[in-house]
Design a protein with these regions (language model features):
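Membrane-interface helix-cap regions at the ends of transmembrane helices
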Residues: 41-61, 133-145, 174
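Juxtamembrane helix-loop boundary signature in multi-pass membrane transporters
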Residues: 1-8, 103-163
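Alpha-helical transmembrane segments of compact multi-pass small-molecule transporters, enriched
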Residues: 38-46, 97-111
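Loop-to-transmembrane-helix transition segments
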Residues: 2-9, 48, 55-81, 150-163
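Structural motif at transmembrane-helix junctions in multi-pass transporters
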Residues: 25-32, 81-97, 174
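Juxtamembrane helix-loop-helix junctions in multi-pass membrane proteins
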Residues: 15-40, 53-58, 164-174
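Small-residue-mediated transmembrane helix hinge/kink sites in multi-pass secondary transporters
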Residues: 21, 83, 109-110, 173
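Hydrophobic/small/kink-forming positions within alpha-helical transmembrane segments
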Residues: 10-14, 18, 45, 72-77, ...
Length: 174
C-alpha cells in the first residue's frame, strides 16, 4: 500500500510544480504560498475530520508538538523558497534541485537519527545527485558560488527549498 501512496505523492508533486508555476505568473510568490497554505490547511483538517482523527490533536505531547511545529516552520520555509524559485526559473530546472531534498533527508536521517543506509541506498543517493546535476546547465552550476553570495537567484531558492523540505522530514520524524 505504501508504494501506491508514494506513487500518488510523486504524481501530485509533479502536478503541483506545473500548477504552481502557472499560479506565480501573475502574483507574488509569497501571496501564492499563502493561498496554497490555506488550501492545504483546510484540506488536512477536513481529512482529519472525515477520518475521525481530529480529536487526537489534544493528546500530542509537548515534545512531539514542538517538533511538529518546527517541521511546519520548515515546510513553510520550503514552500516560500520553492515558489520564489519557480517565479524566477523554469519548472524543468527548479523541480530537480528541489527533489534533492530526498538525498538531504536520507543523509540527515543517517547522521541525526542513526537510520541505516545500505550499499544500494548509497548508490541510489549518488545516482539521484548525479541525475540532478545533469539536469542543470553547467554554467548555472559554475555560477553557484556567486548565486549563493548574491541571493535572489532561482538556484539559491531551489537549494533552500530542498534543505527546508529535508528538515521537514527529519523534524516530523523526531
Amino acid at each position: 500500500m505504501w508504494i501506491l501512496a508514494a506513487s500518488l505523492s510523486a504524481l501530485f508533486a509533479g502536478l503541483t510544480a506545473v500548477l504552481a508555476k502557472a499560479g506565480v505568473a501573475s502574483t507574488s510568490s509569497t501571496v501564492a504560498t499563502a493561498l496554497r497554505t490555506v488550501v492545504v490547511a483546510v484540506g488536512a483538517w477536513g481529512m482529519a475530520a472525515l477520518t475521525g482523527t481530529a480529536s487526537g490533536v489534544t493528546s500530542i505531547d509537548g515534545t512531539s508538538a514542538l517538533f511538529l511545529v518546527l517541521s511546519g516552520l520548515a515546510t513553510g520555509a520550503s514552500w516560500l523558497c520553492y515558489f520564489a524559485a519557480l517565479s524566477r526559473g523554469d519548472v524543468s530546472r527548479v523541480a530537480p534541485i528541489d527533489k534533492l531534498s530526498t538525498v538531504l533527508a536520507i543523509i540527515l536521517a543517517l547522521v541525526l537519527l542513526g537510520e541505516p543506509v545500505s550499499v544500494w541506498g548509497a548508490a541510489g543517493i549518488i545516482a539521484i545527485t548525479a541525475g540532478t546535476l545533469l539536469m542543470v546547465e553547467p554554467d548555472e552550476l559554475s555560477g553557484l558560488p556567486r548565486a549563493l553570495r548574491g541571493g535572489g537567484s532561482w538556484l539559491t531558492f531551489a537549494l533552500a527549498s530542498a534543505l527546508f523540505a529535508a528538515l521537514t522530514s527529519i523534524l516530523g520524524k523526531v
